[in-house]
Curated annotation (Swiss-Prot):
Species of provenance: Burkholderia lata (strain ATCC 17760 / DSM 23089 / LMG 22485 / NCIMB 9086 / R18194 / 383)
Alphabetized GO MF terms: nickel cation binding
Family classification: Belongs to the UreF family.
GO cellular component: cytoplasm
Cited Gene3D superfamilies: Urease accessory protein UreF (1.10.4190.10)
Protein name as it appears in the record: Urease accessory protein UreF
Length: 226
């Protein structure tokens, strides 16, 4: 990996990226309300489960395949699979989350003129667009390798989940850093599993997440949008 590719992925995984990731907890806040999370250990276990049981089987392999489709500029497959991913979201708020963040990242890519004109036109025509599809576009525009792209995406997800736990549980900063360190190995394993997953084996089935997310939509008191 070149320094340019590394810096590009650090940029994409940064919490400073203006796509609104900080405003979502992806069910963590609802899990807290259901008393599934109540301290640092249960927060770590929840985030680890989301990484290994949900992302590694669904979002990460989907991202890898969308990355390959952007490289090939396979527009029909990009559009079809993007629509499939959006339809697979288990609740209205999870669908709005991926659409809002995907749109924001796509707008950023267009404004910064990442990628060639033909691919930018394809990106602009994809509405709504899921976050992994937009992330794959940005990564492809910087010629980043698939394993590094997935690692950056997974780390950004873990970091955002940890940040949500710090605010909602609440936890201290050191507890948050311990969670991130503890999940480094799980990120590597999730990436390896995702890269070995063929397109027809991508699986976003996550009933507990779906139920908690649906409950969160009417939760009395909330900090986050999901």
């Amino acid at each position: 990996m070149t320094t340019t590719e590394l810096v590009a992925l650090l940029h994409l995984a940064s919490p400073a990226l203006p796509i609104g990731a900080y405003s979502y907890s992806q069910g963590l806040e609802a899990a807290l309300d259901a008393n599934l999370i109540h301290d640092a250990d249960t927060a770590r276990d929840w985030i680890a489960s989301g990484l290994t049981d949900v992302l590694a089987h669904g979002e990460l392999p989907f991202l890898a395949h969308q990355l390959a489709r952007w490289h090939a500029h396979d527009t029909p497959a990009l559009v079809t699979e993007n629509a499939w991913f959006i339809a697979s979201r288990e609740s209205a708020e999870l669908r709005r989350e991926t659409e809002q963040m995907g749109w924001s990242l796509a707008q950023l890519c267009a404004s910064l003129e990442w990628g060639d004109a033909a691919r930018r036109a394809t990106l602009a025509a994809m509405t709504p667009i899921a976050l992994p599809t937009a992330f794959a576009y940005a990564a492809a525009a910087h010629d980043a390798s698939a394993d590094a792209v997935l690692a950056a995406y997974a780390f950004g997800w873990v970091e955002n989940q940890t940040s949500a736990a710090l605010k909602a549980v609440p936890l201290g900063q050191l507890a948050g850093q311990r969670i991130i360190v503890a999940l480094r190995g799980a990120i590597d394993a999730a990436v390896r599993r995702a890269l070995a997953t063929p397109p027809d084996a991508v699986n976003t089935f996550a009933p507990q997440l779906g139920i908690l997310s649906a409950r969160h939509e009417t939760q009395y008191s909330r900090l986050f949008r999901s």
